[in-house]
Curated annotation (Swiss-Prot):
Function: Component of chylomicrons, very low-density lipoproteins (VLDL), low-density lipoproteins (LDL), and high-density lipoproteins (HDL) in plasma. Plays an important role in lipoprotein metabolism as an activator of lipoprotein lipase, the enzyme which hydrolyzes the triacylglycerols on chylomicrons and VLDL.
Species of origin: Panthera tigris altaica (Siberian tiger)
Keyword match Transport: yes
Protein name: Apolipoprotein C-II
UniProt-annotated location(s): Secreted
Keywords from the UniProt entry: Chylomicron, Glycoprotein, HDL, LDL, Lipid degradation, Lipid metabolism, Lipid transport, Secreted, Sialic acid, Signal, Transport, VLDL
InterPro entries the record matches: Apo-CII (IPR008019), ApoC-II_dom_sf (IPR023121)
Family classification: Belongs to the apolipoprotein C2 family.
Ranges where the record places region Lipoprotein lipase cofactor: 78-101
Modification after translation: Proapolipoprotein C-II is synthesized as a sialic acid containing glycoprotein which is subsequently desialylated prior to its proteolytic processing. Proapolipoprotein C-II, the major form found in plasma undergoes proteolytic cleavage of its N-terminal hexapeptide to generate the mature form apolipoprotein C-II, which occurs as the minor form in plasma.
Major place of residence: secreted
Recorded GO CC terms: chylomicron; intermediate-density lipoprotein particle; low-density lipoprotein particle; spherical high-density lipoprotein particle; very-low-density lipoprotein particle
Signal peptide: 1-22
């Protein structure tokens, strides 16, 4: 029984020693510089910013006021038509539910 206790004690001490060394190495790695994840995030944010700026420039170069007015006019006429037909449909449903001829 004494040898088993000694063996368990040595094993526990070995595990604790490895854990302490691993903790010191982790602290040294953190102190050396930014992590790989933060470097990747910075890189992706840079790419996203440049793509966003390029898209904004392209939009500003191709912006046509006449086309914008046509789109706004088409939108207003289509929404007016949808409003009319929605009103008709609502009246029909209400008349069916109330039983009015």
């Amino acid at each position: 029984m004494g040898t088993r206790c000694l063996l368990v004690l040595l094993l526990v001490l070995l595990v604790l020693k490895c854990e302490v060394q691993g903790d010191d190495m982790a602290r040294q790695d953190e102190a050396t510089g930014p992590t790989l994840l933060s470097q990747m995030q910075e890189s992706l944010y840079g790419y996203w910013g440049s793509a966003k700026a390029a898209a904004q420039d392209l939009y500003e170069k191709t912006y046509l006021t006449a086309m914008d007015e046509k789109i706004r006019d088409m939108y207003s006429t289509s929404t007016a038509a949808v409003r009319i037909y929605t009103g008709i449909l609502t009246d029909q449903i209400l008349s069916m539910l109330t039983g009015d001829p």
